[in-house]
Amino acid sequence: MKKIFLFAFSLVVMTSCKEPVKQYTTSSPEIETIKTLHKYFEDGNYEGLKDLYSEDAEIFENSFESRPVANLITEGKDSRSYIEDYNFKEGIKCEMIINDEGEKWVNSWAHWKGTLKGSNKQIEIPIISRFLFKDGKIVKEYSYWDNLPGYVAFEDLASEKLEKLEKTLEEDK
């Protein structure tokens, strides 16, 4: 009787143990969404971004103030008009963390590279981002990068064009 009781007790204990929740992963549907997001940026498919974000998503890019997805799309299209050869050198590195509150956060690291239109000036910028997901959509984004390489490249291009213009004006005198 004692053995039956111990066996039954052991069986109950073994079957009642839950599999621990996996809190860290490098493969998930959310990570695939972030890879799709970066692919949309590379391809210039800014309208496709609407499918990845919730309607009321908060986007913080180098700012403490959030902006809506519509602004991200408009600004992306505008700035893309100055860039050709837009790509993420060496792809995107991602990991997902499920915190103690059950929130799904995807962290991504990218090395962005682009060439200014009308020149051979290349810009390379490392980007780090965090995305909070809810119901399969991005509800919050924090992205940070250094804008200085872009400013310097645009300033150099403007200086070159100004020098050419001054030279042309001098020749016309």
Give the ranges of each region predicted by the language model.
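Sec-dependent N-terminal signal peptides
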Residues: 4-14
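Positively charged n-region of N-terminal signal peptides that target proteins for export
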Residues: 1-4, 19
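Low-complexity, intrinsically disordered terminal/linker segments enriched in charged
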Residues: 140-173
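A solvent-exposed, acidic/Ser-Thr-rich amphipathic alpha-helical stretch
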Residues: 45-98, 104
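A short, structured loop/turn motif at beta-sheet edges
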Residues: 97-104, 132-139
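Short, low-complexity N-terminal intrinsically disordered segments enriched in polar/charged residues
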Residues: 17-46, 51, 161-173
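Exposed beta-sheet edge and beta->alpha loop/turn motif
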Residues: 109-138, 145-148
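Hydrophobic pocket/interface hotspot
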Residues: 37, 48-50, 57, 72, ...
